[in-house]
């Protein structure tokens, strides 16, 4: 199955309510999305990376430490065991770790417009449960996703789809929390996605030049079992078709290019209106 990922022409934006048009950050919905760099579009259209370049889920602490140079850091592919990988690295000038710690909980509460401005063509809503935990001023900003589920509607290629993202404390995801706060991992968020294709997800970031380097990994084909363990979700001998990670890669490079463009001013304007 071949997919045509043409990102050169703008798509149709999702709908907004009249109440959303009155919000102070509606202007970010109205503006054009930031263009995806040509080199990333070339990677998208260039086909999957080799299976041996897909970092195994069991080696995820290498990713956190920044000791994963033998693996790809931008691209998509299918691993030898049939699971799939999406990886992306985004330089975000003018962005700080504090802004990203704020962004991930902020966009999941309040108006649906908060999620829409991230990618106005593909994002419909993201709603946190329990929202009371997210908005609790006693919860540290970098912990406001821990144990929180985001109920989402977005389009990563095939059409709008419902998704549940189960965010985890890093230790519950199998991460060594002593790595957090070190040179290659200032902070992170991690979650298990429940949808038509289960996946484990991590976004981490650290200072780089005059901003941050934002690094994403999606291990497609993993789920949470009854005991709370993250396990492979596909049968032996079955492989995820390459168009699945390709579609997610296309979406990822689009949404995080746009987030990098809007976050510095958005944070300056909205950081006190959680």
Swiss-Prot record:
GO MF annotation terms: metal ion binding; phloretin hydrolase activity; protein homodimerization activity
Localisation: Cytoplasm
Gene Ontology CC, one term: cytoplasm
pH and activity: Optimum pH is 7.0.
Cofactor entry: Zn(2+)
Subunit-level organization: Homodimer.
Family classification: Belongs to the DAPG/phloretin hydrolase family.
Enzyme class: hydrolase
Job of this protein: Catalyzes the hydrolytic C-C cleavage of phloretin to phloroglucinol and 3-(4-hydroxyphenyl)propionic acid during flavonoid degradation. Also hydrolyzes other C-acylated phenols.
Keyword terms: Cytoplasm, Hydrolase, Metal-binding, Zinc
GO biological processes: flavonoid catabolic process
Protein name: Phloretin hydrolase
Comment on activity versus temperature: Optimum temperature is 37 degrees Celsius.
């Amino acid at each position: 199955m071949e997919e045509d990922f043409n990102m050169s022409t703008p798509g149709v934006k999702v709908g907004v309510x009249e109440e959303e048009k009155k919000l102070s950050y509606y202007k970010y919905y109205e503006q054009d999305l930031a263009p995806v760099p040509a080199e990333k579009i070339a990677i998208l259209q260039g086909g999957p990376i080799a299976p041996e370049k897909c970092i195994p889920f069991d080696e995820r602490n290498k990713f956190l430490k920044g000791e994963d140079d033998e693996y790809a850091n931008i691209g998509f592919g299918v691993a030898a065991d049939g699971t799939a990988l999406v990886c992306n690295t985004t330089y975000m000038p003018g962005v700080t770790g504090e802004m990203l710690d704020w962004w991930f909980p902020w966009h999941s509460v309040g108006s649906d417009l908060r999620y829409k401005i991230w990618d106005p063509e593909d994002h419909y809503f993201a709603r946190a449960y329990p929202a009371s935990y997210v908005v609790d001023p006693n919860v540290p900003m970098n912990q406001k996703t821990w144990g929180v589920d985001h109920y989402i509607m977005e389009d990563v290629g095939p059409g709008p789809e419902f998704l549940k993202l189960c965010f985890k404390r890093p230790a519950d995801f199998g991460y060594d929390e002593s790595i957090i706060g070190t040179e290659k991992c200032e902070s992170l968020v991690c979650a298990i996605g429940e949808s038509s294709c289960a996946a484990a997800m991590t976004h981490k970031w650290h200072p780089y030049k005059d901003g941050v380097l934002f690094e994403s990994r999606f291990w497609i084909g993993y789920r949470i079992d009854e005991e709370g363990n993250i396990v492979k979700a596909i049968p032996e001998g079955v492989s995820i078709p390459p168009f699945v990670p390709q579609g997610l890669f296309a979406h990822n490079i689009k949404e995080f290019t746009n987030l990098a463009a809007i976050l510095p001013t958005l944070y300056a304007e909205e950081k006190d209106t959680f």
